[in-house]
Amino acid sequence: MSDFFHSDVLSVSELNAFAKSILENHLAGLWIAGEVSNLTRAASGHYYFSLKDSRAQVRCAMFKGAAARLAQPLKEGDHIEVAGKISIYEARGEFQITVNEVRLKGLGQLYEAYERLKAQLQAEGAFAAERKKPLPVRPQCIGIVTSLAAAALRDVVTTLKRRAPEIPVIVYPAAVQGAGSGFQIAQAIKTASQRAECDVLIVCRGGGSIEDLRAFNEEPVVRAIEACTIPVVSGVGHETDFTLADFVADVRAPTPTGAAELVSPNRQESLHRLVQAQGRLKTVLEQRYFDASQKLDWLARQIRHPRQKLDEQRASIGKLAQTLSYSMTQNLRAHTARFERQTQALQHCRPDVSVYRQDIVRLQTALPAAFSRLLARRRQSLTAQAALLEAVSPQHILERGFSVVKNTRGQVIRNADVLKQGQKLHITFSDGETDVRVSKEQGQQDLFDCI
């Protein structure tokens, strides 16, 4: 561990990398069995699913290249065996299997070979319906390919003797299980085809496991049936058993006994089927006659005279006219009632003009007297304010014997101390004005010299 990491304390990424290395280096080449669940197929063609058993599950990813090699698409609930790289997705620390190979659980390579050959034959058209040969209605001779010791042979012969004892039977013996059985079956079919002694050939054996039925899934047997010039009926195993021989045969029977019944006519059954067919035909004809009669009656009821249709239209127009008249009358009444209500409301809202007229006359009479009184008060106030203004006016003060002395700059002289000898002054009296000059050589009463 010290060679892989630089510290005894691992980071999460180091732990995941270490676990991934252990899994990939020590768990290679394993096959894991389980049930498919949570299956998702992405648009890219990849599969993502879980493989589970009764106690645990593991996430699996199967990429497009491996998925293309599947014999058939995976389905939810499939019991399979997978092989691939067992690893950890480091980013999330999730244990997963990157699947490279898949096979059905319990079948392994045998089932894979079956599916590969089936896909190949299907691609070649070996199972196509158009290459199937019809069975003869009444064969002159029936051939059987099976083991002489097989119970299936006894079942087939017993059925043929019961149903068509007059038809001869030829058996082409071959082992139907074990080593070399596929080759023997193929040779027996080829022999029957070459001799052309029979009109139809039954290839059959009893039921068994897929291993027991292995010979009927081998390519030599399938190719021999495909190349056979005689119509071949397969009766291999039970109804639930399907082999490649069943797919390539001209007709597949669920059992060996069923194959014998298919190729042998039964006079009593044929007569019975004929009677049944006659009964069914009669029933069908009677039902068709009854249906046609009902349809004819219905069509007859649908056909009406033009006058009847015109009367219906006239009645409809009359009804519409009545409805329109009634609607207009109701509308007019509603508007009239509304107009009357609004007229009454307007009358209640109209003011009493006579009352307002009396108020106007009274106000017109009182207005001149009020205006005269207001004017007298305004004149009296104006006279008082004029007298007050006159009393404090400069002109009135001058008339009382005062004068105003100003220097050459127009400033009023209020104190004699600011005067200088020879200073020019301007004096304003109530009735005129004059210019003087200051002279200190005289007494105060002669302070100024007239200029």
Curated annotation (Swiss-Prot):
It catalyses: Exonucleolytic cleavage in either 5'- to 3'- or 3'- to 5'-direction to yield nucleoside 5'-phosphates. It is found in: Cytoplasm. One of its GO terms (cellular component) is exodeoxyribonuclease VII complex. The keyword Hydrolase applies. InterPro entries: Exonuc_VII_L, Exonuc_VII_lsu_C, OB-fold_nuc-bd_dom. GO terms for biological process: DNA catabolic process. It is an enzyme of class 3 (hydrolase). GO terms for molecular function: exodeoxyribonuclease VII activity; nucleic acid binding. It comes from the Bacteria. Keywords: Cytoplasm, Exonuclease, Hydrolase, Nuclease. Belongs to the XseA family. Bidirectionally degrades single-stranded DNA into large acid-insoluble oligonucleotides, which are then degraded further into small acid-soluble oligonucleotides. PANTHER family: EXODEOXYRIBONUCLEASE 7 LARGE SUBUNIT (PTHR30008:SF0). Heterooligomer composed of large and small subunits. This is Exodeoxyribonuclease 7 large subunit. It comes from Neisseria gonorrhoeae (strain ATCC 700825 / FA 1090).
